[in-house]
Amino acid sequence: MAEEHVVYIGKKPVMNYVLAVITQFNEGAKEVSVKARGRAISRAVDVAEIVRNRFLPEVRVKEIKIGTEELPTADGRTANTSTIEIILEKP
């Protein structure tokens, strides 16, 4: 999957990310990856579910990957942060 078919979830409203995913599919993408870290994980799940249930019912979840990233903190230690990648597929 090309890197341009990735939507990174942050602090913006959920519908901004939903629109980004729908735009990717409308431009011909067969798969779109929704990625998030930490507190944005629940927002990523919301984005995937809103796309599937409200806007594009033919889209399905192909794969869900979860993991942990070690991020450096201001005082030199490392903090573990959870990550998720939800791959949506349009048949």
From Swiss-Prot:
Taxonomic superkingdom: Archaea
Q: Which GO terms describe its cellular component?
A: chromosome; cytoplasm
For the keyword Cytoplasm, the answer is: yes
GO biological process entries: chromosome condensation
Principal location class: cytoplasm
Instruction: State where the protein is found.
Output: Cytoplasm; Chromosome
Q: Where is the signal peptide?
A: none
Modifications after synthesis and translation: Acetylated. Acetylation at Lys-11 decreases DNA-binding affinity.
Where in the sequence is N6-acetyllysine found? K11
GO MF terms held by the record: double-stranded DNA binding; RNA binding
Q: Which UniProt keywords apply?
A: Acetylation, Chromosome, Cytoplasm, DNA condensation, DNA-binding
Entry's family note: Belongs to the histone-like Alba family.
Q: What does this protein do?
A: Binds double-stranded DNA tightly but without sequence specificity. Involved in DNA compaction.
Instruction: Specify the protein name.
Output: DNA/RNA-binding protein Alba
> Gene name?
albA
